[in-house]
Regions:
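Enriched for short, Lys/Arg-rich terminal
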Residues: 1-5, 11-17, 21-27, 31, ...
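A short, surface-exposed loop/turn module that caps and links secondary-structure elements
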Residues: 35-62
């Protein structure tokens, strides 16, 4: 099975801190990232799907409720682009 090395963007770091301040269950996000880094598919509950338009080439999965993770797989890297609510990620 192919594994990926996580690569974090500056926006993702800011998003992550915002989620922590909101006291969201960060272990849920970390679990999803761990699954993706192992090269495994996420369960259906994550509603993992490709994005289009400005985000073409990226994927989005739902961590819980309105909480999403936007990522991209490139070569051996899992690029963590954004995380937060839909408004946080797609309205800026």
């Amino acid at each position: 099975m192919k594994g990926y090395i996580p690569q974090i963007t500056g926006k993702y770091k800011k998003d992550y801190r915002r989620c922590e301040k909101r006291q969201w269950e960060m272990n849920l996000l970390d679990d999803a990232i761990e699954i993706l880094c192992r090269g495994e598919q996420l369960d259906e509950e994550y509603d993992d799907h490709p994005l289009y338009g400005k985000w073409v080439g990226c994927r989005e999965c739902h961590i819980g409720g309105d909480w999403v993770l936007v990522y991209k797989k490139k070569e051996r890297y899992l690029i963590l682009r954004r995380t937060g609510s839909h408004d946080d990620v797609f309205s800026r």
